[in-house]
């Protein structure tokens, strides 16, 4: 049982490292460098979309694994329903679940904004400068929200791992 729990925790933590680490790398390292490059706004956005699509190939499976392993771990702890509502551990877990749902919704909207037809419009210069700036702003804001939610969820996971006492 201890080995099973250790493996489960390892998979969960590795998936969190991929999701949160990759998101931070894109937001805190790649985006600022890209902003200072002498490319056009369209070229920068095209490159960011390509990087995002590539990242999604590993990030989405990592997020799915995080959700599944997190639900399983919560199920193990919550053998009694009163733990969820009558303890600080349960309260932290409820907050974490709400933030995970908010993260999934935010991420889905973020990905939906950059659909294939929008990407094709950018590549073929069929999008106005005004639309491009609006799109960039939405992408940046949703990306920032995703990163902030991810970091907060990671902190809540650390609190839960330490026993859920504040």
Regions found by a protein language model. Give the residues of each.
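Polytopic transmembrane helical bundles with strong interfacial aromatic enrichment
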Residues: 1-166
């Amino acid at each position: 049982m201890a080995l099973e729990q250790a493996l489960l925790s390892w998979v969960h933590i590795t998936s969190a490292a991929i999701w949160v680490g990759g998101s931070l790398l894109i937001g805190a390292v790649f985006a600022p460098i890209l902003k200072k490059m002498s490319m056009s706004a369209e070229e920068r956005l095209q490159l960011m979309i390509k990087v995002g699509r590539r990242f999604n190939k590993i990030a989405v499976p990592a997020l799915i694994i995080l959700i599944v392993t997190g639900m399983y771990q919560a199920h193990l702890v919550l053998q009694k329903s009163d733990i969820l509502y009558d303890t600080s551990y349960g309260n932290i877990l409820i907050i974490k679940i709400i933030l995970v749902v908010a993260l999934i919704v935010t991420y889905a909207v973020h990905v939906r904004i950059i659909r294939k037809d929008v990407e094709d419009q950018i590549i073929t210069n069929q999008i106005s400068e005004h639309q491009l700036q609006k799109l960039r702003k939405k992408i940046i804001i949703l990306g920032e929200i995703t990163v902030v939610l991810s970091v907060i969820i990671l902190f809540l996971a650390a609190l839960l791992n330490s026993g859920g006492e504040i």
